Amino acid sequence: MLRLVLLVVVCLSSYSVLGFVRGPAANSFSRRSSLKMMSDLNLAAMPTVEEWLDVADPKLKKATLAMFRACKEIAYKIRTASCDKMACFNEFGDEQLAIDILANNVIFDNLKASGAVATASSEETPTEDPMGGSGYSVAFDPLDGSSVIDTNFAVGTIWGCWPGDKLTGISGRQLKAAGIAVYGPRTTITVALDNLPHSHEFLLVDDFSAMHGQWIKTNEFMSIGEGKLFAPGNLRATQDNPGYQELFQYYMENMYQLRYTGGMVPDVNQIMVKGKGVFMNVNSKKTKSKLRVLYEVAPIAYLIEKAGGLSSEGEKSALDISIDTTEQTSQVAYGSPDEVKRFEKLVGRKYL
Protein backbone atom coordinates (compact mmCIF):
# COMPACT_ATOMS: atom_id res chain seq x y z
CA MET A 1 0.00 0.00 0.00
CA LEU A 2 2.82 2.40 0.90
CA ARG A 3 4.48 1.74 -2.45
CA LEU A 4 1.19 2.42 -4.30
CA VAL A 5 0.77 5.76 -2.53
CA LEU A 6 4.39 6.68 -3.31
CA LEU A 7 3.94 5.85 -6.98
CA VAL A 8 0.76 7.96 -7.21
CA VAL A 9 2.37 10.91 -5.43
CA VAL A 10 5.46 10.77 -7.66
CA CYS A 11 3.41 10.56 -10.85
CA LEU A 12 1.02 13.36 -9.83
CA SER A 13 3.94 15.56 -8.81
CA SER A 14 5.61 15.04 -12.17
CA TYR A 15 2.35 15.66 -14.05
CA SER A 16 1.59 18.89 -12.18
CA VAL A 17 5.11 20.22 -12.72
CA LEU A 18 5.07 19.47 -16.44
CA GLY A 19 1.59 20.93 -16.77
CA PHE A 20 2.59 24.34 -15.50
CA VAL A 21 6.04 24.77 -17.04
CA ARG A 22 6.00 26.26 -20.53
CA GLY A 23 8.50 27.58 -23.07
CA PRO A 24 12.23 26.75 -23.40
CA ALA A 25 12.48 25.68 -19.75
CA ALA A 26 9.88 22.97 -20.22
CA ASN A 27 12.14 20.44 -21.96
CA SER A 28 14.91 20.84 -19.39
CA PHE A 29 12.45 20.65 -16.51
CA SER A 30 10.84 17.62 -18.10
CA ARG A 31 14.16 15.76 -18.28
CA ARG A 32 15.01 16.56 -14.65
CA SER A 33 11.53 15.63 -13.51
CA SER A 34 11.66 12.35 -15.43
CA LEU A 35 15.02 11.46 -13.87
CA LYS A 36 13.67 12.31 -10.42
CA MET A 37 10.56 10.24 -11.07
CA MET A 38 12.63 7.27 -12.22
CA SER A 39 14.81 7.59 -9.12
CA ASP A 40 11.78 7.58 -6.83
CA LEU A 41 10.14 4.74 -8.76
CA ASN A 42 13.29 2.64 -8.50
CA LEU A 43 13.58 3.26 -4.76
CA ALA A 44 9.93 2.45 -4.21
CA ALA A 45 10.37 -0.87 -6.05
CA MET A 46 13.25 -2.01 -3.84
CA PRO A 47 12.59 -4.00 -0.65
CA THR A 48 13.25 -2.32 2.66
CA VAL A 49 15.29 -4.15 5.27
CA GLU A 50 12.12 -4.70 7.33
CA GLU A 51 10.48 -6.47 4.38
CA TRP A 52 13.61 -8.45 3.54
CA LEU A 53 13.92 -9.68 7.13
CA ASP A 54 10.43 -11.18 7.12
CA VAL A 55 12.05 -14.53 6.25
CA ALA A 56 14.07 -14.49 9.48
CA ASP A 57 13.16 -15.80 12.90
CA PRO A 58 11.19 -12.98 14.64
CA LYS A 59 13.80 -12.46 17.35
CA LEU A 60 16.65 -12.54 14.85
CA LYS A 61 14.77 -9.89 12.87
CA LYS A 62 14.50 -7.72 15.99
CA ALA A 63 18.20 -8.12 16.81
CA THR A 64 19.23 -7.33 13.24
CA LEU A 65 16.95 -4.30 13.01
CA ALA A 66 18.46 -3.05 16.26
CA MET A 67 21.85 -3.00 14.56
CA PHE A 68 20.44 -1.20 11.52
CA ARG A 69 18.89 1.47 13.75
CA ALA A 70 22.15 1.84 15.67
CA CYS A 71 24.18 2.21 12.47
CA LYS A 72 21.82 4.88 11.17
CA GLU A 73 22.35 6.87 14.36
CA ILE A 74 26.12 6.33 14.22
CA ALA A 75 26.18 7.54 10.60
CA TYR A 76 24.49 10.76 11.68
CA LYS A 77 26.87 11.28 14.60
CA ILE A 78 29.90 10.75 12.37
CA ARG A 79 28.65 13.26 9.79
CA THR A 80 27.70 15.95 12.31
CA ALA A 81 30.54 15.75 14.82
CA SER A 82 33.99 17.30 14.48
CA CYS A 83 36.47 14.73 15.79
CA ASP A 84 40.12 14.40 16.61
CA LYS A 85 41.84 11.37 18.13
CA MET A 86 40.77 12.25 21.68
CA ALA A 87 37.25 13.65 21.54
CA CYS A 88 34.38 14.87 19.40
CA PHE A 89 32.56 18.18 19.31
CA ASN A 90 28.94 18.69 18.32
CA GLU A 91 27.62 21.48 16.11
CA PHE A 92 27.68 23.85 19.09
CA GLY A 93 31.33 23.14 19.87
CA ASP A 94 30.54 21.14 23.02
CA GLU A 95 33.03 18.36 23.77
CA GLN A 96 31.54 14.85 23.75
CA LEU A 97 32.80 11.33 24.24
CA ALA A 98 35.22 9.99 21.61
CA ILE A 99 33.22 8.87 18.60
CA ASP A 100 33.97 5.17 19.07
CA ILE A 101 32.60 5.34 22.65
CA LEU A 102 29.53 7.15 21.37
CA ALA A 103 29.04 4.39 18.79
CA ASN A 104 29.56 1.77 21.48
CA ASN A 105 26.82 3.26 23.66
CA VAL A 106 24.39 3.63 20.76
CA ILE A 107 24.69 -0.06 19.87
CA PHE A 108 24.28 -1.26 23.46
CA ASP A 109 21.18 0.93 23.88
CA ASN A 110 19.55 -0.44 20.73
CA LEU A 111 20.35 -4.06 21.56
CA LYS A 112 18.85 -3.66 25.04
CA ALA A 113 15.71 -2.09 23.60
CA SER A 114 15.19 -4.94 21.12
CA GLY A 115 14.22 -7.52 23.76
CA ALA A 116 15.77 -10.18 21.52
CA VAL A 117 19.36 -10.07 22.80
CA ALA A 118 20.46 -11.96 25.90
CA THR A 119 24.15 -11.08 25.85
CA ALA A 120 26.29 -8.55 24.02
CA SER A 121 30.00 -7.85 23.90
CA SER A 122 31.95 -5.00 22.35
CA GLU A 123 35.57 -4.77 21.31
CA GLU A 124 35.67 -1.57 23.37
CA THR A 125 34.55 -3.43 26.51
CA PRO A 126 35.38 -7.12 25.87
CA THR A 127 33.11 -8.65 28.50
CA GLU A 128 29.88 -10.58 28.08
CA ASP A 129 27.18 -8.20 29.31
CA PRO A 130 23.51 -9.10 29.93
CA MET A 131 21.05 -7.21 27.74
CA GLY A 132 17.83 -8.29 29.46
CA GLY A 133 16.35 -10.06 26.45
CA SER A 134 16.43 -13.62 25.13
CA GLY A 135 17.14 -15.45 21.90
CA TYR A 136 20.49 -14.23 20.59
CA SER A 137 23.87 -12.84 21.54
CA VAL A 138 25.68 -10.12 19.60
CA ALA A 139 29.40 -9.29 19.39
CA PHE A 140 30.45 -6.08 17.67
CA ASP A 141 33.23 -3.68 16.84
CA PRO A 142 31.43 -0.34 17.12
CA LEU A 143 33.76 1.68 14.92
CA ASP A 144 36.45 -0.19 13.04
CA GLY A 145 39.10 2.20 11.72
CA SER A 146 38.28 4.99 14.18
CA SER A 147 41.97 5.99 14.27
CA VAL A 148 41.59 7.44 10.75
CA ILE A 149 38.26 9.16 11.28
CA ASP A 150 39.93 12.55 11.76
CA THR A 151 41.27 12.27 8.19
CA ASN A 152 37.70 11.68 6.89
CA PHE A 153 38.47 8.17 5.59
CA ALA A 154 35.66 5.61 5.46
CA VAL A 155 35.11 3.69 8.70
CA GLY A 156 32.72 0.92 9.67
CA THR A 157 30.86 -1.22 12.17
CA ILE A 158 31.11 -5.02 12.35
CA TRP A 159 28.79 -7.44 14.13
CA GLY A 160 27.90 -11.08 14.45
CA CYS A 161 24.75 -12.64 15.92
CA TRP A 162 24.84 -16.07 17.59
CA PRO A 163 21.95 -18.09 19.05
CA GLY A 164 21.76 -18.44 22.82
CA ASP A 165 23.25 -16.44 25.65
CA LYS A 166 27.02 -16.88 25.39
CA LEU A 167 29.84 -15.58 23.20
CA THR A 168 32.64 -17.98 24.11
CA GLY A 169 32.93 -21.69 23.41
CA ILE A 170 31.54 -20.99 19.95
CA SER A 171 32.78 -20.55 16.38
CA GLY A 172 31.74 -18.64 13.30
CA ARG A 173 29.97 -21.76 12.04
CA GLN A 174 27.18 -21.09 14.57
CA LEU A 175 26.50 -17.56 13.33
CA LYS A 176 22.90 -16.82 12.40
CA ALA A 177 23.60 -13.37 10.97
CA ALA A 178 26.47 -10.96 10.46
CA GLY A 179 26.91 -7.53 8.99
CA ILE A 180 29.21 -4.63 8.25
CA ALA A 181 28.25 -0.97 7.95
CA VAL A 182 30.37 1.36 5.83
CA TYR A 183 30.25 5.07 6.65
CA GLY A 184 31.64 6.64 3.51
CA PRO A 185 30.26 8.85 0.72
CA ARG A 186 27.19 6.62 1.12
CA THR A 187 26.11 4.69 4.21
CA THR A 188 25.61 1.01 3.43
CA ILE A 189 25.18 -2.20 5.37
CA THR A 190 26.01 -5.62 3.95
CA VAL A 191 24.32 -8.40 5.88
CA ALA A 192 23.94 -12.17 5.59
CA LEU A 193 21.45 -14.54 7.21
CA ASP A 194 21.82 -18.23 7.96
CA ASN A 195 18.69 -19.24 6.04
CA LEU A 196 19.39 -17.18 2.90
CA PRO A 197 22.16 -17.53 0.30
CA HIS A 198 24.57 -14.70 -0.49
CA SER A 199 25.35 -11.38 1.19
CA HIS A 200 23.01 -8.45 0.67
CA GLU A 201 23.73 -4.72 0.56
CA PHE A 202 21.35 -2.05 1.88
CA LEU A 203 21.64 1.69 1.28
CA LEU A 204 20.57 4.31 3.82
CA VAL A 205 18.49 6.76 1.80
CA ASP A 206 19.46 10.23 3.00
CA ASP A 207 18.19 12.43 0.18
CA PHE A 208 14.86 14.28 0.12
CA SER A 209 12.84 11.49 -1.47
CA ALA A 210 9.82 9.85 0.10
CA MET A 211 12.09 6.97 1.17
CA HIS A 212 14.32 9.22 3.30
CA GLY A 213 15.74 7.44 6.35
CA GLN A 214 14.94 3.94 5.12
CA TRP A 215 17.33 1.10 4.36
CA ILE A 216 16.76 -0.10 0.78
CA LYS A 217 18.25 -3.26 -0.72
CA THR A 218 20.56 -2.28 -3.56
CA ASN A 219 22.86 -5.23 -4.22
CA GLU A 220 23.38 -8.96 -3.74
CA PHE A 221 26.89 -10.40 -3.65
CA MET A 222 27.01 -13.96 -5.02
CA SER A 223 30.56 -14.57 -6.21
CA ILE A 224 34.13 -13.38 -5.69
CA GLY A 225 36.27 -14.24 -8.68
CA GLU A 226 39.86 -13.79 -9.68
CA GLY A 227 41.29 -10.33 -10.16
CA LYS A 228 44.57 -8.57 -9.47
CA LEU A 229 43.54 -6.51 -6.46
CA PHE A 230 45.07 -6.87 -3.00
CA ALA A 231 44.81 -5.14 0.38
CA PRO A 232 47.73 -6.17 2.63
CA GLY A 233 47.45 -5.41 6.34
CA ASN A 234 50.34 -5.44 8.82
CA LEU A 235 52.96 -5.06 6.09
CA ARG A 236 55.68 -4.85 8.76
CA ALA A 237 55.32 -8.61 9.04
CA THR A 238 56.98 -9.03 5.63
CA GLN A 239 60.31 -8.26 7.36
CA ASP A 240 60.32 -11.41 9.49
CA ASN A 241 57.75 -13.65 7.83
CA PRO A 242 59.40 -15.07 4.67
CA GLY A 243 56.12 -16.49 3.39
CA TYR A 244 54.38 -13.13 3.57
CA GLN A 245 57.36 -11.47 1.93
CA GLU A 246 57.21 -13.99 -0.92
CA LEU A 247 53.47 -13.44 -1.31
CA PHE A 248 53.90 -9.67 -1.43
CA GLN A 249 56.66 -10.06 -4.00
CA TYR A 250 54.33 -12.23 -6.10
CA TYR A 251 51.78 -9.42 -6.14
CA MET A 252 54.38 -6.89 -7.20
CA GLU A 253 55.85 -9.05 -9.97
CA ASN A 254 52.40 -9.82 -11.34
CA MET A 255 51.28 -6.19 -11.40
CA TYR A 256 48.49 -6.41 -8.82
CA GLN A 257 46.65 -3.22 -7.87
CA LEU A 258 47.19 -2.12 -4.27
CA ARG A 259 43.90 -1.06 -2.67
CA TYR A 260 44.42 -0.55 1.07
CA THR A 261 42.66 2.20 3.06
CA GLY A 262 43.77 1.44 6.61
CA GLY A 263 40.30 0.21 7.55
CA MET A 264 39.33 -3.45 7.27
CA VAL A 265 35.63 -2.77 6.69
CA PRO A 266 36.03 -0.66 3.51
CA ASP A 267 38.83 -2.94 2.29
CA VAL A 268 36.69 -6.05 2.64
CA ASN A 269 33.63 -4.27 1.30
CA GLN A 270 35.43 -3.41 -1.94
CA ILE A 271 36.20 -7.10 -2.49
CA MET A 272 32.48 -7.94 -2.37
CA VAL A 273 31.45 -4.92 -4.45
CA LYS A 274 34.16 -5.44 -7.09
CA GLY A 275 33.72 -9.20 -6.98
CA LYS A 276 37.46 -9.86 -6.88
CA GLY A 277 40.63 -9.52 -4.84
CA VAL A 278 42.06 -10.46 -1.46
CA PHE A 279 42.55 -8.87 1.96
CA MET A 280 44.96 -10.22 4.56
CA ASN A 281 46.41 -9.36 7.95
CA VAL A 282 49.36 -11.61 8.77
CA ASN A 283 51.37 -12.65 11.82
CA SER A 284 55.16 -12.76 12.09
CA LYS A 285 57.70 -13.38 14.84
CA LYS A 286 57.62 -9.78 16.08
CA THR A 287 54.28 -8.41 14.91
CA LYS A 288 51.02 -10.21 15.56
CA SER A 289 47.69 -9.45 13.94
CA LYS A 290 45.45 -7.50 16.30
CA LEU A 291 42.21 -8.69 14.72
CA ARG A 292 39.89 -10.26 17.27
CA VAL A 293 38.13 -13.40 16.19
CA LEU A 294 34.84 -12.70 17.98
CA TYR A 295 34.33 -9.10 16.92
CA GLU A 296 36.00 -8.93 13.51
CA VAL A 297 37.43 -12.12 12.02
CA ALA A 298 34.43 -14.47 12.31
CA PRO A 299 31.64 -12.05 11.26
CA ILE A 300 33.53 -10.89 8.16
CA ALA A 301 34.46 -14.49 7.27
CA TYR A 302 30.75 -15.27 7.37
CA LEU A 303 29.92 -12.43 4.97
CA ILE A 304 32.76 -13.27 2.58
CA GLU A 305 31.91 -16.97 2.39
CA LYS A 306 28.21 -16.18 1.92
CA ALA A 307 29.28 -13.91 -0.95
CA GLY A 308 31.09 -16.77 -2.69
CA GLY A 309 34.63 -16.21 -1.43
CA LEU A 310 36.84 -17.98 1.07
CA SER A 311 38.42 -17.10 4.40
CA SER A 312 41.44 -18.67 6.09
CA GLU A 313 43.61 -18.35 9.17
CA GLY A 314 46.41 -20.05 7.24
CA GLU A 315 45.14 -23.60 7.06
CA LYS A 316 41.38 -23.69 7.59
CA SER A 317 38.35 -21.44 7.27
CA ALA A 318 38.23 -18.61 9.79
CA LEU A 319 34.71 -19.82 10.57
CA ASP A 320 36.24 -22.94 12.15
CA ILE A 321 38.36 -21.07 14.72
CA SER A 322 37.17 -21.99 18.20
CA ILE A 323 36.44 -18.77 20.10
CA ASP A 324 37.62 -19.50 23.63
CA THR A 325 38.01 -15.92 24.90
CA THR A 326 36.64 -12.55 23.85
CA GLU A 327 40.15 -11.18 23.34
CA GLN A 328 41.44 -14.01 21.13
CA THR A 329 43.18 -12.80 17.95
CA SER A 330 44.13 -14.39 14.63
CA GLN A 331 45.71 -13.64 11.29
CA VAL A 332 43.29 -13.96 8.40
CA ALA A 333 42.82 -13.75 4.63
CA TYR A 334 39.53 -13.06 2.82
CA GLY A 335 38.78 -13.06 -0.88
CA SER A 336 38.64 -15.12 -4.04
CA PRO A 337 39.22 -18.87 -3.64
CA ASP A 338 42.49 -18.99 -5.60
CA GLU A 339 43.96 -16.02 -3.74
CA VAL A 340 43.10 -17.44 -0.34
CA LYS A 341 44.60 -20.80 -1.32
CA ARG A 342 47.78 -19.00 -2.41
CA PHE A 343 47.86 -17.34 1.03
CA GLU A 344 47.57 -20.75 2.71
CA LYS A 345 50.37 -22.18 0.55
CA LEU A 346 52.88 -19.35 1.07
CA VAL A 347 52.01 -18.00 4.52
CA GLY A 348 50.29 -20.86 6.31
CA ARG A 349 50.13 -21.05 10.10
CA LYS A 350 53.82 -20.88 11.00
CA TYR A 351 53.51 -17.83 13.24
CA LEU A 352 50.10 -18.45 14.79
Each language-model region and where it sits:
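N-terminal chloroplast transit peptides
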Residues: 1-28
